[in-house]
Swiss-Prot record:
Protein source organism: Streptomyces avermitilis (strain ATCC 31267 / DSM 46492 / JCM 5070 / NBRC 14893 / NCIMB 12804 / NRRL 8165 / MA-4680)
EC number: 6.3.5.3, 3.5.1.2
SMART domains: GATase_5
Protein name from the UniProt record: Phosphoribosylformylglycinamidine synthase subunit PurQ
Subunit structure: Part of the FGAM synthase complex composed of 1 PurL, 1 PurQ and 2 PurS subunits.
Keyword Zinc: no
Gene of this entry: purQ
CC terms in the record's Gene Ontology section: cytoplasm
């Protein structure tokens, strides 16, 4: 049986179709989910894609968090369903309290769009098992509100429990994708929940799945092959 991975479309989503294509390339079946529907159509996992849902009014992800579909996503995530939040999806996950912390405006107050160097910190989640811990990858990044923040106690907890999933790689030229692009505390690019089934990150793996587009690399494809293997072997 083919694994079914749902992709939610909110008003203002930009990358839902790209995410569906990435899922298909990985060998799973993408399933379109609408923000007004509570029915997840018997999917095995869910992706909240990037974009500017509801125009980022009030706060990025704050309105989407109350969409009817999110009631079911929150319930299922707490029961163990794998959920991935990409960019705006990450913002929604923090607003829904499925992941700790919050996303604020970039420290330089500008929209940023570039290829970004990341280091895999946790390769034991539902979405990262096809990577190796310490592996460095290139993933496109595009955001205005990408600065991850949390209080020191939460940051220390994430570090101690190995819940920092990805970190921006510093120490090189920005033109080569190095550096913290938005002022995220402790260079955090992505985190996971305690169970490892919910992951959020700001960069866009769905834009790095084919060699002819994006970075010219396929460094984002393991997100989708990781979850496929987990679902098939469950």
């Amino acid at each position: 049986m083919t694994a079914r991975i749902g992709v939610v479309t909110f008003p203002g989503s930009l990358d839902d179709r790209d995410t569906q294509r990435a899922i298909k390339l990985a060998g799973a079946e993408p399933v379109a989910l609408w923000h007004k529907d509570k029915d997840l159509k018997q999917v095995d996992a869910v992706v909240l894609p990037g974009g500017f849902s509801y125009g980022d009014y009030l706060r990025a992800g704050a309105i989407s968090r109350f969409s009817p579909v999110m009631e079911t996503v929150i319930e299922q995530a707490k029961s163990g369903m794998p959920v991935l939040g990409i960019c705006n999806g990450f913002q929604i996950l923090t607003e829904a309290h499925l992941l700790p912390g919050a996303m604020l405006g970039n420290n330089h107050l500008h929209f940023i769009c570039r290829d970004q160097k990341l280091r895999v910190e946790n390769a034991d989640t539902a979405w990262t098992s096809d990577y190796e811990a310490g592996q460095e990858i290139h993933i496109p990044l595009k955001n205005m509100d990408g600065r991850y923040v949390a209080d020191e106690r939460t940051l220390d907890m994430l570090e101690a429990e190995g819940r920092v999933a990805f970190r921006y790689v510093v120490g090189g030229a920005a033109a080569d994708g190095y550096g913290n692009p938005n002022g995220s505390l402790r260079d955090i690019a992505g985190i996971t929940n305690e169970a490892g089934n919910v992951v959020g990150l700001m960069p866009h793996p769905e834009h790095a799945v084919e060699p002819l587009i994006g970075t010219g690399r396929t460094d984002g494809l393991p997100f989708f092959t990781s979850i496929l293997k987990k679902l098939v072997n469950a």
